[in-house]
Structure formats: structure tokens, C-alpha cells
């Protein structure tokens, strides 16, 4: 049969006649009557009795249910099959009524009592009140119809590990004239006899009936004969079921109640155990039901939490960036979820409820922990960025590095702790120390990075200052090498190094660094300054040959007033050459080693003796040693670290220097000789004597013919004019061959120019006075200067 609903009542077949528990229908029934909302405020009433004894009729009148009743006109037969469940109408608290299949029915036969025992045990296990429906005329009879039923009830009660204390309400039907006060003692005596006759376990052999049951007796008139009186008695009995679980009520001292939300599952599990013919451990069953139901409630709340809009929105905000009041908001959401669990699981076993609550809380915390970690990550990142910006700004306005780093570190860590406190939720004692430690490491790493960068900048700054202060001055000093060069370099080095070290030390004072580190940086700057000089000295040493040639050329080709020399032949070329070479050798000796210390050396003397005065060197070799003082790769008492040019290299450089400057000296000698030749136009004496001897006849011929003298005079004048016009001495200063070529090119134009001038003068009137003639000659001369350039143009 299907579930039946009528106004104010709802019934369902809980277990069918074949003993099959109807899970789906009972679940729908529980939802329809909203049993889960009742908590512990509900009662279960069941009725037992012989078949066709009016059980369903009694329940329908007493509780307003709609169980199927037997139609007396159709004969007596089985009406209720299995176990039916209904909710009473108009009774508080919520009361569930179970109508059990009647006992001693012919449909099952005498031998099939298994279902009777199973249903009886089931009713005792889940009912708070058990109605025993019996006929009045059976009281006091040895073979009464209710005796097998009572034996069955007492026997199955022994199968409960820890039996509940159940109220057993005997309803005496069709009461006769015998007063209830007389019937009740007889009934109780019969009940006690049955109890005593039932075999019991050792633990309960002496246990009185009152430890298991509260026995109540009520009598009702015949429904068929005295219907009105029956209904009045039913109404009175109904009042006893109002607030039945309150202290003093019919079920006021019940124990081990299963919360209403677990009723369906509990009944299912109890029936399974009973069907398997196992002893029913109700306390263990209660724990089991609590475990399953609390687990279901916890899972349900966890699933609801996952889909909770507030949580989803909060999680999305966390993914997007920092969230304010995260801890407070999440605490509220978690608290609401756990409160809902507590509300639904409050009536289950406390140990199980607490355990499952803890598991739910752990699952929830495990779910929200990534969001919490993200929040901490946002906080850490934000604080780190704030520290970087604030720290850099503080350094930018000139605040000391150490004080700025310490002040902002403290401020940022305080802010981090405050923001972490705002992110903590009440339900968890999460540790933020790891994130805090990471933030500390990140800040310290940034401080270290900035410190390294700033120290590097300071080092680079002062190194650049040192390089700028030393590089060019040292180069200039080494270029003009003299006896005071290295002394001046040392003073410059000392002055600039001390200035840079002082500035660096002042700058480092704000870094709060160890003395050892500071000294190391100062030492590094000092070494750098020395390195600048050494590097520049090495660069100049590489160019020493070029510098020597430049110095030689400067001194050799210029006089004391720095004017270019004109080799007239009067200069002491040997002395000039020696002076220039001495100056070049001075440069070589200065560049041979680095002299930043106070250690003396004999390099200049050695070079002078070995290279400039070979005679003295030969004497020295004969008297002192037979070895060459420059035949070595090191200088005496000079370490190799200070050596720029070794003795062997000096000798090689000097040899190359002399070779490359030899041409300059040779050119000077040639210039002197050419100058001497240019200033002496008389032939040698032997040539004059030869001319006199050989030209005597020609001379005498001229004396005898005066006309030859006139011709010779004119030829002399013409030759002198050509001499002047052609500038023959000037042309031959450049050499004989170039002079001849130049003169030959200008000869014909010059002759033609002279002829034109003479012709022009012959055409002028002779009346001009001498002054006018001179003026005319001057004008003509100015118009046609005897310059070869004019002649060239004319040509």
C-alpha cells in the first residue's frame, strides 16, 4: 500500500509484510512531516496486540490517524500488514505512531512467529511508549491471548544490550463492570509472573521489571456497545499523550533518544540488525546513528559552504588583490556554517557530534587556508613594496642608510603584524611566522641589495674622482719627466687619496657597518688610487720610445727660447745632440720603475754610464766587472712589481731610439754643410790660380780690343739682372737638381720680360729729368717686379 494523506495526518508503510524496509517512502514521509526540525522533541508510540483486536481503530480515534480498520461485517481477517507509521494530528510534541501487524494471525500460522518477534523488538527499540491492546476478559486467565505477546516482548527485550526504559501502557478493551482498581493488580501480577518465567542473561537474572518498563494500565469501554463513553475515555487518554516527553509525562524518563533527523536512518539500521538475528546494542547503535547523521550533516554544510555566495565573493576578491577585514568576514561565514551544523546535530551523541564538528571545521579550514595564504601573500607583497618605496625615498632626501633601514623595517613589520591580526580567523590558530620570516628575509635582502648598490655607487664615485684627479695630471707629469716627477706624483697621490678616503669615510658613517668592512673599502680605494698611477705609468712606459723621440726632437730642433733652430753652421751640433739624448735618457730612467715609495735607486746613473758615456762604461767594465749592467731582467734593489721597463728593454729601446734619431742628426749636419756652401761663392784658390794661368791670353785679348770690354759689360749687366730676377741663390738652397729645374723653367720668360722692359724704356721721351726717370723706372719696376711668380703668370 502507498502512503496515505488526509487532513492533519500522514501515514506510510514503514515495513511491508515481507519485512522489507521502505527507505524511499520513509524519507519522503520525514520530509513531509518536517520531522528533522523537531530535534529531540518528538515521541514514538507503537501498539501491539492480537490480530483483529481493534488496534488500528484505537489509534485512529486516539491520535487522529487514518490507519485501515477491519470491516466487521466482512468477517475477521488481517487488516494491517507489516508496520505502518503515521504522525498524530494535534498532539505536541510531534508524535509518531506505529501500527504493528497483529499477533496470532491465521495468515501467518502458528509456526511463523519470526516476524512477530522481529516487529516486537523493533517497536521496543525505537518506541518511547508501547500500547498493549488486550481484552478485559483475558485478565486472570492462564491461556489468555495476551500472554504469548507479553512473553515475546520480554524475550526480545533481553536481546537489547542496554535496553531502553519503555513505558508499557496496557489498554484494557471492552471493560466490564469490574472496577479497574480490581483488575489492575491481577494484571500486574500476571505480568510479573510472565517476567519471572522468561529466561534472562546472568546480568539480568535479578533485575526487576521496573528497570525495563514503566507499566501503566487504562481501561476503555466497548466501542461497539458504548461508543460515546468510549470516545469520552479516548479523549481523556489523549490528554495524557500531550507533552508526553516532559518530566512526569508518559515518556518523561526515557533514555537514549535518537535526534529526529536521524530517525529514518536509525530505524533502517535497527531493522537490518534485527533481520540478521543479531543482538541489538542500542548504545552502540546510537553512536553509529550519530556518526552517520553527523557525517551527513557535516558534508551537507561543507557543500553549502562551497557554494556560499559570501565565501565565493570573498575568495574572488582575494584572488584579485588585498582584502580588508578578511579575518572578520571569513570568521562570520565559518561561524554561520558551524552554527548551522550545531543546530542540526545538537541532539546527537556529544562525543560524535564534537568529533564530526571538528572534522568539518578542519575541512573548512583546509578549504579556506589557500585564500588565507593568498591574503598573507598580498600583505607581505604590499608591505615589501611599501618598504622599498619608503626606504628609497628616505635615502633620496639624505637620511642615513642605517637609520632609514631600521626605522622603516620596524614600521613595516608593525604594520604587517597588524594586518595579519586582521586576517586571522577565530576558528583557526594559524601561524603567520613563516610568512613573517619570509618578509623579514625579503626586506633584509632588499636592504643588502641596496647597501651593495649604494656602496658600489660610493666606491665608483670616489674611484672616478680619484681617477679624474690622478689620471691626466700623472700623464702630464710623466710626459715631462724630470728629477722631481715621482716626488710630485707621490705628493699628488697622497693628497688626492687622503681627500677621497676622507669623503668615503664620511659617507660610510651612515651605513653602520663593521670596522673591518669599512677598513677594507678604504684600503680598496687606496689600492685603486695606486693602481691608477701604476696603470698610467705602464701606459706611458709602452709609449716611452715615442716620448723619447718627441723630447729629442723638441730639444734638438728648438733653441732655449723654444724657437726653431736654423742650421747656419755655427751651432755646436755635438753638444746639442748630447743634450737632447740626455733629456731623452732622463725620460727613460724616470719611466723605468714606479717610485711611489721612498726607496732610492741608481737607475739613472746606470743608464747614463751604460748608454750615454760608453767610455766611462768601458773603464768601469775594465776596473769593476766584465758584465754589462743592462744585461739583466731586473734592477738592483727594485722589486719586479715596481718595474716598468727592465734593463734589457732599456738597452733595446735606447738602441732603437738612436737608430731612429740618427737621421735627424744627419739632416742637421747636411743642412750645416749646405749653408756653408751657400755662403761661399768664390772658387777654391787652386781654381783661381788655374784661371789666371789658363786665361791670361784671353785677358790680354780683351785689353787689346776695348769693344770686347763693352760687350762684356753689357753681358755682365744682363747676367746680374737675370741673377736677381731668377733668385738663383734661393733656388739652389733646395738642392742642385731642384734649383736647375726651377731656373730652366723660368729662364726664357724672364729674358723676354727684360727685353720688353728695355724696349719700353727706349720709346719714352728723353726730356724727362732724372727724378722723373727714376720715378718711371720705379713704376715700371713695380708694375713688373722681378718675381718669378709674375713671370710665371706672364708665361
Curated annotation (Swiss-Prot):
Residues 218-244 form a coiled coil. Residues 761-795 are annotated as: Disordered. Residues 39-254 form the GB1/RHD3-type G domain. CDD domains: GBP (cd01851). Residues 785-795 have a biased composition (Basic and acidic residues). Belongs to the TRAFAC class dynamin-like GTPase superfamily. GB1/RHD3 GTPase family. RHD3 subfamily. Specifically expressed in flowers. GO terms for cellular component: endoplasmic reticulum membrane. It is a multi-pass membrane protein. This is Protein ROOT HAIR DEFECTIVE 3 homolog 1. Probable GTP-binding protein that may be involved in cell development. It comes from the Eukaryota. Residues 1-682, 728-795 are cytoplasmic. It comes from Arabidopsis thaliana. Keywords: Coiled coil, Endoplasmic reticulum, GTP-binding, Hydrolase, Membrane, Nucleotide-binding, Transmembrane, Transmembrane helix. It is found in: Endoplasmic reticulum membrane. GTP binds at residues 49-56. It is an enzyme of class 3 (hydrolase). Residues 704-706 are lumenal. The lineage of its organism: Eukaryota, Viridiplantae, Streptophyta, Embryophyta, Tracheophyta.
Amino acid at each position: 500500500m502507498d502512503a496515505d494523506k488526509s487532513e492533519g495526518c500522514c501515514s506510510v508503510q514503514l515495513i511491508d509484510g515481507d519485512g522489507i524496509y521502505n527507505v524511499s517512502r520513509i524519507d519522503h514521509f520525514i520530509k513531509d512531516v518536517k520531522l528533522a526540525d523537531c530535534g529531540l522533541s518528538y515521541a514514538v508510540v507503537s501498539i501491539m496486540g492480537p490480530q483483529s483486536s481493534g488496534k488500528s481503530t484505537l489509534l485512529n480515534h486516539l491520535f487522529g490517524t487514518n490507519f485501515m480498520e477491519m470491516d466487521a461485517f466482512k468477517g475477521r481477517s488481517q487488516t494491517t500488514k507489516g508496520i505502518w507509521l503515521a504522525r498524530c494530528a494535534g498532539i505536541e510534541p510531534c508524535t509518531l505512531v506505529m501500527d504493528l501487524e497483529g499477533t496470532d494471525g491465521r495468515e501467518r500460522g502458528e509456526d511463523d512467529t519470526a516476524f512477530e518477534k522481529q516487529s516486537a523488538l523493533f517497536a521496543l527499540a525505537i518506541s518511547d511508549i508501547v500500547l498493549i491492546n488486550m481484552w478485559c476478559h483475558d485478565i486472570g486467565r492462564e491461556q489468555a491471548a495476551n500472554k504469548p505477546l507479553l512473553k515475546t516482548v520480554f524475550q526480545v527485550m533481553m536481546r537489547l544490550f542496554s535496553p531502553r526504559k519503555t513505558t508499557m501502557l496496557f489498554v484494557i478493551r471492552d471493560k466490564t463492570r469490574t472496577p479497574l482498581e480490581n483488575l489492575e493488580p491481577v494484571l500486574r501480577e500476571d505480568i510479573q509472573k510472565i517476567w519471572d518465567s522468561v529466561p534472562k542473561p546472568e546480568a539480568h537474572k535479578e533485575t526487576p521489571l521496573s528497570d525495563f518498563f514503566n507499566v501503566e494500565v487504562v481501561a476503555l469501554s466497548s466501542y461497539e456497545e458504548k461508543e460515546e463513553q468510549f470516545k469520552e475515555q479516548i479523549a481523556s487518554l489523549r490528554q495524557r499523550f500531550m507533552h508526553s516527553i516532559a518530566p512526569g509525562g508518559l515518556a518523561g524518563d526515557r533514555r537514549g533518544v535518537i535526534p529526529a533527523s536521524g530517525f529514518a536512518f536509525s530505524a533502517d539500521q535497527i531493522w537490518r540488525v534485527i533481520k540478521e538475528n543479531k543482538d541489538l546494542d542500542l548504545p552502540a547503535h546510537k553512536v553509529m546513528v550519530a556518526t552517520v547523521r553527523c557525517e551527513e550533516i557535516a558534508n551537507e554544510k561543507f557543500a553549502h559552504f562551497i557554494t556560499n555566495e559570501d565565501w565565493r565573493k570573498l575568495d574572488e576578491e582575494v584572488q584579485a588583490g588585498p582584502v580588508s577585514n578578511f579575518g572578520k568576514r571569513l570568521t562570520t561565514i565559518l561561524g554561520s556554517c558551524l552554527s548551522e551544523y550545531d543546530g542540526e546535530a545538537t541532539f546527537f551523541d556529544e562525543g560524535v557530534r564534537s568529533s564530526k564538528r571538528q572534522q568539518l571545521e578542519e575541512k573548512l579550514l583546509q578549504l579556506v587556508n589557500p585564500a588565507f595564504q593568498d591574503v598573507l601573500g598580498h600583505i607581505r607583497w604590499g608591505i615589501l613594496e611599501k618598504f622599498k618605496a619608503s626606504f628609497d625615498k628616505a635615502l633620496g632626501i639624505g637620511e642615513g642608510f642605517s637609520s632609514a633601514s631600521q626605522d622603516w623595517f620596524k614600521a613595516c613589520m608593525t604594520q604587517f603584524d597588524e594586518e595579519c591580526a586582521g586576517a586571522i580567523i577565530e576558528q583557526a590558530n594559524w601561524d603567520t611566522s613563516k610568512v613573517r620570516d619570509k618578509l623579514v628575509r625579503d626586506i633584509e635582502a632588499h636592504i643588502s641589495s641596496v647597501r651593495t648598490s649604494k656602496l658600489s655607487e660610493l666606491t665608483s664615485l670616489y674611484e672616478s674622482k680619484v681617477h679624474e684627479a690622478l689620471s691626466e695630471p700623472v700623464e702630464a707629469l710623466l710626459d715631462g719627466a724630470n728629477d722631481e716627477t715621482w716626488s710630485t706624483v707621490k705628493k699628488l697621490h697622497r693628497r688626492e687619496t687622503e681627500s677621497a678616503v676622507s669623503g668615503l669615510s664620511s659617507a660610510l658613517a651612515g651605513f653602520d657597518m663593521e670596522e673591518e668592512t669599512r677598513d677594507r673599502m678604504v684600503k680598496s680605494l687606496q689600492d685603486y688610487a695606486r693602481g691608477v698611477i701604476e696603470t698610467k705609468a705602464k701606459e706611458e712606459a709602452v709609449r716611452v720610445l715615442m716620448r723619447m723621440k718627441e723630447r729629442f726632437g723638441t730639444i734638438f730642433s728648438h733653441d732655449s727660447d723654444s724657437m726653431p733652430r736654423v742650421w747656419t753652421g755655427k751651432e755646436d751640433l755635438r753638444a746639442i745632440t748630447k743634450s737632447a739624448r740626455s733629456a731623452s735618457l732622463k725620460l727613460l730612467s724616470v719611466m723605468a720603475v714606479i717610485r711611489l715609495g721612498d726607496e732610492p735607486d741608481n737607475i739613472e746613473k746606470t743608464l747614463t754610464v751604460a748608454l750615454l758615456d760608453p767610455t766611462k762604461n768601458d773603464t768601469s767594465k775594465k776596473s769593476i766587472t766584465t758584465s754589462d749592467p743592462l744585461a739583466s731582467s731586473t734592477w738592483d734593489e727594485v722589486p719586479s712589481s715596481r718595474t716598468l721597463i727592465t734593463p734589457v728593454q732599456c738597452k733595446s729601446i735606447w738602441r732603437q731610439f738612436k737608430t731612429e734619431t740618427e737621421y735627424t742628426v744627419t739632416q742637421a749636419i747636411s743642412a750645416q754643410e749646405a749653408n756653408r756652401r751657400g755662403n761661399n761663392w768664390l772658387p777654391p784658390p787652386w781654381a783661381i790660380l788655374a784661371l789666371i794661368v789658363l786665361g791670361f791670353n784671353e785677358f790680354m785679348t780683351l785689353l787689346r780690343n776695348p769693344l770686347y770690354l763693352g760687350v762684356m759689360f753689357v753681358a755682365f749687366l744682363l747676367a746680374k739682372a737675370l741673377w736677381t730676377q731668377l733668385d738663383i741663390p734661393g733656388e739652389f738652397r733646395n738642392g742642385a737638381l731642384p734649383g736647375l729645374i726651377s731656373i730652366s723653367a723660368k729662364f726664357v720668360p724672364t729674358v723676354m720680360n727684360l727685353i720688353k722692359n728695355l724696349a719700353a724704356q727706349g720709346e719714352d721721351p728723353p726730356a724727362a729729368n732724372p727724378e722723373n726717370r727714376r720715378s718711371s723706372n720705379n713704376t715700371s719696376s713695380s708694375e713688373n717686379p722681378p718675381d718669378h711668380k709674375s713671370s710665371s703668370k706672364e708665361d
